[in-house]
């Protein structure tokens, strides 16, 4: 029988005995299964029959919006972990966007999260709660089934959430909340926009949530291990942009209350970038980071990596543009670690203009008294390769520089 770690004494989940979350069976959930299946069929059949590039653009934009503002900021970092403070109207808007992901209502999603979190911290964990079965069985379980425990533990949700009338309304009507945006999409673009902007969006979000969850608990790198926990989170670098930073799951298991998930050099975290923008606008405050959390004696570092801290300067865009314009003549050279892109791929992209230095914090370029890091550095080094590469770099540099300025200039603390 698993014992309850001291760290769980203040957890929202209160089981009579910890083994309560081990004893249960996985059963088909008709409503859950019908919800996902109907959305998926409508997305595939209706989406293919009415495809337009405009509708596909609506799908991409709406999916990115609800994942960033809804799931990552609203549901996860705010509602579940309360890792920053914001005006109530903005909190409501973010959480409402989270409902548009199509996973559950706000209270149901919080309960699901807390049960998994509690169970995964114990020395043993049910396969359903740990994504511990085979790939296809886990897909069936998570997308079409539910875990029915023999004795359900009590889950204590703070009255500010559980007693909130708006959240209780969303909990009762979360499936119906797809209708308002669907009606708007229909008015603008007809059935094509509905199939792509609603059905395909919900299907992609729900399926993607399971898929990332499966890999983030079974495969991927780790900076930390939680001793005594049955399940360790894993970092999935290649999906950091798609998930708005949520795929840095090992970091999240280590510091669950942190508003920042991409904690180390090269770990892109769009959710964090947006929090910095909102903070600059005065819309959020009291941001929690790892150093603000209580010490966890069970948390153990596995490598010597240090959280990203000091930025490599803040050059003006004019300086970056000047380097790009003269990149071929100046013989620009780029060096740094291969974090998101492999060293082999960087060598193919940049040729002799790249030196792999695993100990470096980030990719960097230094020339003519200007130092650039990250994506701008990659753009400048790429521009030195050929005319076509330079044209691509010209198109990408403004976005790369803007992202870098958000990362450096708006960095909390």
For every predicted segment, state its role:
Residues 213-268:
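Glycine/small-residue-rich hydrophobic helix-like segments
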């Amino acid at each position: 029988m698993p014992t309850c770690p001291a760290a769980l004494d203040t957890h929202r989940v209160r089981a009579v005995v910890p083994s309560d979350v081990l004893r249960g069976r996985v059963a088909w959930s008709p409503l859950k299964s019908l919800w996902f299946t109907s959305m998926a069929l409508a997305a595939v059949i209706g989406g293919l029959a009415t495809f337009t590039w405009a509708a596909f653009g609506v799908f991409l934009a709406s999916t990115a919006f609800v994942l960033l503002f809804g799931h990552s900021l609203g549901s996860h970092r705010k509602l579940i972990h309360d890792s920053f403070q914001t005006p109530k109207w903005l909190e409501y808007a973010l959480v409402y966007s989270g409902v548009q992901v199509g996973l559950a209502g706000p209270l149901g999603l919080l309960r699901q999260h807390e049960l998994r979190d509690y169970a995964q911290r114990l020395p043993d964990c049910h396969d359903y709660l740990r994504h511990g079965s085979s790939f296809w069985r886990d897909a069936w379980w998570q997308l079409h089934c539910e875990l029915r425990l023999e004795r359900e533990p009590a889950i204590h949700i703070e009255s500010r959430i559980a007693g909130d009338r708006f959240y209780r309304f969303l909990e009762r009507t979360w499936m119906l909340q797809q209708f308002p945006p669907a009606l708007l999409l229909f008015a603008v673009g007809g059935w094509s926009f509905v199939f792509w902007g609603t059905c395909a969006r919900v299907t992609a979000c729900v399926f993607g949530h399971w898929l990332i969850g499966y890999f983030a608990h079974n495969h991927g790198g780790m900076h930390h291990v939680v001793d005594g926990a049955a399940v360790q989170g894993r970092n999935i670098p290649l999906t950091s942009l798609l998930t708005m930073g949520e795929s840095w799951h090992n970091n999240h298991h280590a510091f669950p209350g942190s508003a920042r998930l991409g904690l180390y050099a090269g770990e892109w975290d769009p959710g964090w970038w947006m929090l910095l923008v909102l903070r600059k606008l005065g819309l959020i405050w009291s941001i929690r980071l790892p150093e603000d959390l209580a010490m966890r004696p069970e948390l153990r570092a596995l490598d010597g990596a240090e959280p990203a801290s000091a930025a490599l300067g803040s050059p003006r865009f004019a300086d970056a543009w000047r380097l790009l314009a003269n990149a071929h003549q100046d013989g620009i050279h780029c060096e740094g670690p291969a974090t998101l892109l492999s060293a082999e791929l960087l060598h193919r992209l940049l040729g002799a203009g790249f030196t792999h230095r695993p100990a470096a914090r980030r990719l960097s370029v230094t020339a003519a008294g200007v130092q650039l890091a990250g994506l701008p550095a990659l753009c400048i080094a790429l521009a030195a390769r050929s005319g076509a590469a330079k044209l691509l770099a010209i198109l990408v540099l403004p976005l790369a520089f803007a992202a870098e300025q958000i990362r450096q200039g708006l960095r909390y603390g």
